[in-house]
Amino acid sequence: MCKYRNSSEIYKAVVYINIQTTIKIRVKVLENSKALKRLIRKLTVETLWIYVVKVLMVYGPMKAYDIKKKLYEFFGLKVPTITVYSVVYKLCSEGILEQVKTGSDVVYKVTDKGVVEYRKALGFIEDIVSKLRL
C-alpha cells in the first residue's frame, strides 16, 4: 500500500528529505548557532523558488539540471537535483514557470505571473530587512 495519498504529499516528502540533506552539509561548514542555522535554511532551501526564478530571469530559459548548476554558480547553493526538479514542477503547476519544448529538450522560462510574484517576494524581503535594521 502506498504511504502517500497524492502527488502533493510525495512532493512534500521528497523536499523534506532533501532539505535535511542540504542542511546537514551547510551546517557543518557554517558552525553557527541553531537559530542562525534555522534562519539560513528558511531563507535558502525552503524558499528555493525565488532563487530559481532569479536564475531564469538573469540567464533566460534553461533545463532543470542547468538551473541546478546556476544556483551553485550564482548563489553558492548546493541543491540536490531532485529538489530542483520538484521545485520547478511545482512552479509550473502554479503558473510561475512555463515548460517549453525545444526539439528533444524541455526548458523552463518565467511567466508574466512569475515576474510579478518574484517582485512581490523581493519587495516583502526588502521591507522585512529594512524593519530589522538598527
Stretches found by the model and what they are:
Residues V15, T21-K42:
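Short, Lys/Arg-enriched N-terminal segment that forms or immediately precedes the first helix
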Residues C92-G103, K109:
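Beta-hairpin "wing" of winged helix-turn-helix
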Residues Y85-K90:
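Short, hydrophobic-biased segments on the C-terminal half of alpha helices
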Residues V115-L134:
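Amphipathic alpha-helical dimerization/coiled-coil segments
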Residues K54-G60, Y72, L122:
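Short, locally clustered residues in the helix-turn-helix/winged-helix DNA-binding domain
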Residues Y65-G76:
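DNA-recognition alpha helix
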Residues V45-T47, M57-D66:
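Short capping segments at the starts of secondary-structure elements
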